[in-house]
Amino acid sequence: MLTRQRRAAAALAARWLRCASGSAKYAPSPGAFAPPPSSLYDVIILGGGHNGLVAAAYLARAGLAVCLLERRGVLGGAAVTEELFPGFKFSRASYLAGLLRPQVIQELELTRHGFRYLPRDPSSFTPTAVHGPHAGRSLLLGVDAAATAASIAQFSHADAAAFPRYEAFLQDVRAVVQPLLDGPPPVSSRGGIAERLGALRRVRASARAALASPGTLEGLAELMTAPAAHILDRWFESDVLKATLATDAVIGALTSPRTPGSAYVLLHHVMGEAAGVPGVWAYVQGGMGALSGAVAAAAREASAHLCTNADVAEVLLDASGGAEGVRLRGGAVLRAKAVLAACTPHHLFRELMPADAVPPTFAKHIAHVDYSCG
């Protein structure tokens, strides 16, 4: 009986992996491609993931003629809700929201388009073996500080006292890093006065946060380079708590808590913000596809054309080497003043660009980009 159950579980797991695997990313879509109403745009966007959708919404709201092309039959990229089993819908890849900046939600009016956060409380549950040293006790971490402290105290009173200080330390480091992430990256030294002043304001905000909390810069340097286990061992003594927190350092990465640099992911997981609460991640009502759907609705409202089942075969270049449009797999040609790539560098430079248009050294670097941890 047990063998049959194991076989059934293995078959179910194999089916899940086939359905949920990212390798289906470029699988042909069953739907038909509906050509956009025009063949000439200000901007063509390659890829209908959340980044491409946000770009489409902002550019269209700025008055530009935008056409977004997505190969799959559903928009959202990794932020999608799909029926992987009959009657059951899942967030297929991305499963939590938190790094979506609040100004994007406000400026694109995503709440009006149906976007809703669902608080994640408790945020984690860690059971222990009934016959183990902890006698089946479980650890719950959540929003209620007193309840969290009581749960941690089951395993260590010292850890219960240290945990708020650990969270405050991460928030202090977050305050230093966050201003630098809220602006566009510097693309050249020839930026205008407004761009340079904006960068200066962000640096000053970061510096003020660092000066307000002595030791934060040293902590940031350590989080960027040290193993997560090194950080957690210094703060806590309970293996149950350390194992729970270590999941933040390894989730979505082929690494271990003792890998140098894994501590950065501890910081990454407090960079989130949901419903105005820093350091918090949340579910999305309707799954992650509902987030993509809200952004798509904002883009369409601004007159962006979002095309699914649009299989781009080639980026077209003008005589100077600049992008001037795309050719679809069926032969149709769309032209634009600019082409924005919201797809992977591998797909863009190795599959869509003419080989002689990509410098050999750059092409070699792109060929060796490792996607195995994403």
What does each of the following model-derived ranges do?
Residues 216-230, 274-297, 307-309:
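Short beta-strand to alpha-helix junction loop
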Residues 307-324:
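A conserved short coil-to-beta-strand element within the FAD-binding core of flavoproteins
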